[in-house]
Amino acid sequence: MKQIILLGDSIRMQYQPVVGEKLADIAEVSGPEENGRWSGYTLNSLRFWLPTLPSPDLVQWNCGLWDMGDDYQEGRHFYPPDLYEETCHRICRILRKVTGKPDLPLVIATTTPTLHGDHEDIRQYNDILRKVAAEENAVVNDLYSVVSPANAEMICEDHIHLTPAGIEAVAEQTARILRGLLKGTA
């Protein structure tokens, strides 16, 4: 049975069990029990998480909402774009290094929309993820495009997390992409 690891924030934690159900015929899906928060937290935590998880055949990861936040009202992102880009590159490299798999297939999931603002920041950070994916030979799972056309039906009252319909839509696309990669058709 193939092993898939999913890493990411609370959005990942919402859809991971459903992805596991959808791929149960070909893979075991696992991930850390904790929230990956921002990219720097995820990068630092790889050394703690990876030894406790199965050796992966494929990893999907995402970070973004925490990175672009301004929780301290400083008028800046928590992780500015240049630091975010550098950290996302490092996540890709460290995943391959720590697993001992220099050709480990990686999928980078884009940040989902929220019901706050105009999404300019989300689009900017997702563009960074696309650039990193191209430079690191990773596949992009565009979750933003799945949720964005139906924000009202897919995002909860908290304006961030997914509704059951959002979870299902994101899990369906994620499972399709991961299945295709495992079967060599993506």
Language-model features: where?
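Conserved donor-binding loops in enzymes that form glycosidic bonds
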Residues: 9, 34, 160
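Short beta->alpha junction loops
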Residues: 31-38
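Active-site neighborhood of phospho(di)ester-bond hydrolases with catalytic His/Asp-centered motifs
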Residues: 6-8, 31, 110
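Short alpha-helical
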Residues: 13-14, 37, 124
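Short glycine/serine/threonine-biased micro-segments
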Residues: 6, 34, 62
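Catalytic nucleophile-elbow at a beta strand-turn-alpha helix junction centered on a G-D-S/GDSL motif
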Residues: 1-17, 68
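Alpha-helical cap/lid subdomain in secreted, periplasmic
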Residues: 22-28, 43-186
